Amino acid sequence: MIQVLDRQLVDLIAAGEVIDSPLAVVRELVENALDAGADRILVRVWWDQWRLEVLDNGQGMDVTELKTSVLPHATSKISTQADLQRIKTLGFRGEALHSLAQVARLTISSRSVASPGCGWRITYSPQGSPEQIEPVAIAMGTRVEVRQLFANFPQRRQAFAKSQQFWRPMVTYLQQLALCHPQVTWQLWQDERLRLSLSPGPNPEAILLQCLKSLQAGQLGYTQQSLSLPVDLENQATSAQLSLTFGYPDRCHRPRPDWLIIAINGRPVNVPELTQTILAVFHRTLPRQRYPLCFAHWQLPPQCIDWHRHPAKTEIYLQDLPHWQGQLKTLLHQSLAILGNDAPPRLNQLLKAAEPKGVYQLQGASSLTETVLGYPKAFKAIAQVCQTYVVVEHDQGIWLVEQHVAHERVLFEQLQRHWQCLPLEQPLVLQGFNPEQVERLQNLGLEIDPFGEDIWAVRSLPALLQGQEEIIAILRELSQVFSLSTAQAAIACRSAIKNGMELDRIAINKLIEQWQQCDNPHTCPHGRPIYLALDESSLARFFRRNWLVNPKTSGS
């Protein structure tokens, strides 16, 4: 017989969906703290006691707000149906605190700016009504205590019996949220042990350097840009912005896509289409089985986002998704085309080791770890070294460019833009190729016809391959690949200037000019670095010229 469930049971079922893990407790409370304007958030966990605590220095609540804050669907963030289309806060449903009261013992202490002298502490019943109210000495802000978590969900307690099952996701979540809100100080404590501490910084780059201790600033790039709006929003008084923090592919990459993070309006989200856009841009810039480090944070008009897809709001419906994908792709290409002029970290260590202690800094010299973005105003290839490297002088220092991989990158991008197979004057005869190999070559655009038993006539080839001495070996190699991109990379590698080949001044200047115009001048299609950069201050430090007040006016 179908029957209507009583309200208490309905609330308990709903609470189990909203608060499904210890991470959900932290997520809901931390997001409330950010909505309250906090710039210092502390999370404490006593897992043996099934107890959590979140403290913040946000605007706090007075006693009237405290009394109603845990009632079902009590919120200060929306009041009408129209508000659902313009959500600007992290929380808005009014479900989290009420759900917490259902699955744990909940106590909240808070003091607002308007509270005279003291704050208030309230312990709540499972229905969200106050059970005990008392004044308390507390600084402005809020302290939420969660005790006896999941006492009425024994199966859930058993699922989280091991601390490893929640610590890693909790640390990861707070790190990702810190990237979205770099102005906030974060701490995560386990009992009396500090598990995570992040200081505020001017941008996400400063947070990444704290999260990944092996990183150095010279490995990262940061850019922020206003975006064009979709056609349906052009006439509205709104704006969009995208900030990118990324690792240069020749200096920084990961064995897993664990630091490829998408965020929208202050919250990490899962949008597979945007993730794939980033992976596609970084394709053929990294070594095999390596992934980019990239944090992409959008500030979008609220009417573009539907947050009602998942209780945790980690999955969304995003309006005009192809438009935002295109904007992301464009900005990533622009950012990767920029050549950094600072020395890589290992060379920095060498230069710092050679620097005497207590010397004066060069006037106007930047730190070695400061990322210098933008093209030099002028450059000149001045020499070839060991018939392998090209020395390039520019207004900010020098580059040492490996000629083969630089030319390989140039040819690869040319092939991507202009892939075309041209007819041969005389067919090229192939022997020892099976039908599967021939089919793969045909899939690349080559025109090949049967010419006898196990003999094939090649009637067209990519322009770069025509006239190659080892054309049969090259075609045999190409017959093993399954994608056009892989074939283009192989052709570029085979056709590029070889190391050990002497180049005249005209040739090296032409090579450097073509290389600098590449979409990604950092790595070859197989992920090898192309250049080593040394700025003027790096050289001055190595040669101990730091005592000079102004090297441009001194003869020393």
From Swiss-Prot:
Could you tell me which species this protein originates from? Synechocystis sp. (strain ATCC 27184 / PCC 6803 / Kazusa)
Q: Does the keyword Cell inner membrane apply?
A: no
Q: Which GO terms describe its molecular function?
A: ATP binding; ATP hydrolysis activity; ATP-dependent DNA damage sensor activity; mismatched DNA binding
Q: Which InterPro entries match?
A: DNA_mismatch_repair_CS, DNA_mismatch_repair_MutL, DNA_mismatch_S5_2-like, HATPase_C_sf, MutL/Mlh/PMS, MutL/Mlh/Pms-like, MutL_C, MutL_C_dimsub
HAMAP family the UniProt entry points to: DNA_mis_repair
Function in brief: This protein is involved in the repair of mismatches in DNA. It is required for dam-dependent methyl-directed DNA mismatch repair. May act as a 'molecular matchmaker', a protein that promotes the formation of a stable complex between two or more DNA-binding proteins in an ATP-dependent manner without itself being part of a final effector complex.
Top-level division of the source organism's lineage? Bacteria
- Which key words are in the record? DNA damage, DNA repair
CDD domains, per database record: HATPase_MutL-MLH-PMS-like, MutL_Trans
Family membership noted in the UniProt record: Belongs to the DNA mismatch repair MutL/HexB family.
* The keyword Metal-binding belongs to this UniProt entry's keyword annotation: no
Q: Name one Pfam family in it.
A: HATPase_c_3
Q: What is this protein called?
A: DNA mismatch repair protein MutL
List GO BP terms, alphabetically. mismatch repair
GO CC terms of this entry:
mismatch repair complex
